[in-house]
Amino acid sequence: MFSNQYIQQRIHKANSLREEGKNPYQNGLKRSLTNAAFLEKYAYVKGLEEPKDKEKCESIVGRVKLLRLMGKACFIKVEDESTILQVYVSQNELNDEFKSLKKHLEVGDIVLVKGFPFATKTGELSIHALEFHILSKTIVPLPEKFHGLSDIELRYRQRYLDLIVNPSVKDVFKKRSLIVSSVRKFFEMEGFLEVETPMMHPIPGGANARPFITYHNALEVERYLRIAPELYLKRLIVGGFEAVFEINRNFRNEGMDHSHNPEFTMIEFYWAYHTYEDLIELSKRLFDYLLKTLNLDSKIIYNDMEVDFNQTSVISYLDALETIGGISKDILEKEDRLLAYLLEQGIKVEPNLTYGKLLAEAFDHFVEHQLINPTFVTQYPIEISPLARRNDSNPNIADRFELFIAGKEIANGFSELNDPLDQLERFKNQVAEKEKGDEEAQYMDEDYVWALAHGMPPTAGQGIGIDRLVMLLTGAKSIKDVILFPAMRPVKNDFNVESEE
């Protein structure tokens, strides 16, 4: 693993430090200020007649990003989590320690510097070193500074390198953290209680998806990594909680692309005595809150598309197919005509698809990508909404919506089905679909039906994909750009290093 000549040179330097009685992996030394705090606290130094303040002494830490050796002195750029600070080191102060530093220090090493603030002739506020310690010797050279880390695959597989070399990547994940904490704060302010439900399920449910399967040794049973927390959260509504939410991982054993990762984060929330129309208004308030928290304008650019949050609209499923998808009513209203139309358009349609699934195929191909501004699409076919409440006026549609922004689904919500007999029949229909070969059809969950039979109040529930939300609000083009360690196809580890020093 460490046979490369450049790595061997660095290992030799680490051993040389040990021979001098220095630990190349020190512990216990503390900084007094972050680099940003140092620059803020001592900004006044640049205005002094003699731009230095020897009475002040601070300790800073970070990774060496740039090293310029000049005989009896050197300038070093040291970066902590957020800020680069220049360090000046002179043989006059460090004596023999300076020789050791010149011999052993390299770009990538993590250091602690103790010294006083001063400004260079060019006016750059810096720290003049009185002590210098290598805290962690880097034995693998970092990618070259000016070209960064451009190999996309390597960036995802070795995210630590990506974070070191590309500061903008770190900014994305800081924004992700802010988005998640802001979503949590919003729901707490709205009176929702955060809960945690199981990650391993005896029966996968809550979504139409293929599960990951594991085995519980102590119980001697198969378990499924959860595809959604929905059925457990609704059990809590049965139990008497009236507003709950959960932010956590879901796992779906399916394909991967720029907007799908098999392990992803969602928020799901359930609200007793409310309807899906209430969820639409709640979602609008959530986005207003997030835009304000992130200091974003109501108009944002995503993938070269202008998204205007002031132009939010609501449209029914069939109206969207007609007015946006361009499919006439006489085609949409007849199953055989719709099938013929899809085939004429060159769309591969699986045999024996139900009318509702044919409508879904048409929607996916002709409508979804055109929904740029926030669009709540309502009145979904009941056949593709097995957990949603049946509409009182039209039993063929569900009291359900999906929110689309920038051509992608961001949220799914509905008035919940709380009739246990209807739910049992829909589960039976899903089982029949699974027996026909639909791997994503839902399983029968009699325990959930039994819970419903104890009475669940009228409830509205919704899920929002956190990863897609972060993509939208940060401008990331791939879901891999907003997940620190995304799923990747296995490759043989290649630890070879070509020095870029």
Swiss-Prot record:
Source organism superkingdom: Bacteria
InterPro entries per UniProt: Aa-tRNA-synt_II (IPR004364), aa-tRNA-synth_II (IPR006195), aa-tRNA-synth_II/BPL/LPL (IPR045864), Lys-tRNA-ligase_II (IPR002313), Lys-tRNA-ligase_II_N (IPR044136), Lys-tRNA-synth_II_C (IPR018149), NA-bd_OB-fold (IPR012340), NA-bd_OB_tRNA (IPR004365)
Cofactor binding note from Swiss-Prot or TrEMBL: Binds 3 Mg(2+) ions per subunit.
Positions contributing to Mg(2+) 2 binding: 409
EC assignment: 6.1.1.6
PROSITE patterns recorded: AA_TRNA_LIGASE_II (PS50862)
Residues the record lists as binding Mg(2+) 1: 402, 409
Gene Ontology biological process: lysyl-tRNA aminoacylation
Cofactor field: Mg(2+)
An example molecular function term from Gene Ontology annotations: magnesium ion binding
Keyword Nucleotide-binding annotated: yes
Enzyme class: ligase
Cellular location(s): Cytoplasm
Gene3D superfamilies xrefs: Bira Bifunctional Protein, Domain 2, Nucleic acid-binding proteins
DNA-binding recorded as keyword: no
Predominant location: cytoplasm
Subunit structure: Homodimer.
Classification via HAMAP family: Lys_tRNA_synth_class2
Similarity annotation: Belongs to the class-II aminoacyl-tRNA synthetase family.
Record protein name field: Lysine--tRNA ligase
Gene of this entry: lysS
